[in-house]
């Protein structure tokens, strides 16, 4: 019984870390083909178009996509519930970026997600504070 308790105590942090890592992983959708639109949808902070902080001005989502020597910085946006065109939702926790890869192979992505008053229009790439649940998230997908 004591050995089982020790094993549980040792495994708990690892399981929690895996759960946190999975929480930041985006849903990747679209045709994973050259020149086709690929969409990454992240679960991020819950926001409202009418609320404070404002999701369009006070947050900035940038995703850098790399493949070999190719590197693209793509801005993302607040997508409310992820289906606002059909639901008319003005609040939610979905954040989205679209990308059309110009080469086959493994594409890596790295997320910069920051929050501050007016950060979306700031020229400073380090403006605002990192949003811990998404900032620094990395991953890959294959084209």
Label each PLM-derived region with a short phrase.
Residues 1-6:
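Positively charged n-region of N-terminal signal peptides that target proteins for export
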Residues 52-60:
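Short coil-to-beta strand junction motifs in C2/discoidin
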Residues 32-37:
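Solvent-exposed, conformationally flexible loop/turn segments
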Residues 40-52:
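Short amphipathic, basic-aromatic surface patches that mediate peripheral association
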Residues 7-17:
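Bacterial N-terminal signal peptides
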Residues 19-23:
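Boundary at the C-terminal end of the N-terminal hydrophobic targeting segment
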Residues 78-143:
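Extended acidic/polar, glycine-enriched regions
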């Amino acid at each position: 019984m004591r050995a089982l308790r020790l094993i549980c105590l040792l495994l708990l942090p690892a399981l929690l870390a895996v759960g946190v890592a999975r929480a930041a992983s985006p849903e990747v959708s679209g045709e994973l083909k050259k020149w086709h639109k690929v969409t990454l949808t992240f679960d991020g902070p819950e926001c409202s178009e009418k609320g404070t902080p404002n999701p369009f001005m006070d947050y900035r989502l940038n995703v850098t996509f790399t493949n070999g020597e190719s590197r693209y910085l793509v801005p993302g946006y607040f997508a409310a519930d992820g289906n606002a065109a059909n639901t008319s939702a003005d609040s939610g926790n979905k954040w989205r970026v679209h990308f059309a890869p110009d080469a086959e192979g493994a594409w890596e992505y790295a997320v910069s997600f920051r929050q501050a008053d007016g950060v979306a229009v700031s020229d400073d790439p380090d403006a605002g504070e990192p949003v811990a649940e998404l900032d620094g998230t990395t991953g890959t997908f294959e084209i």
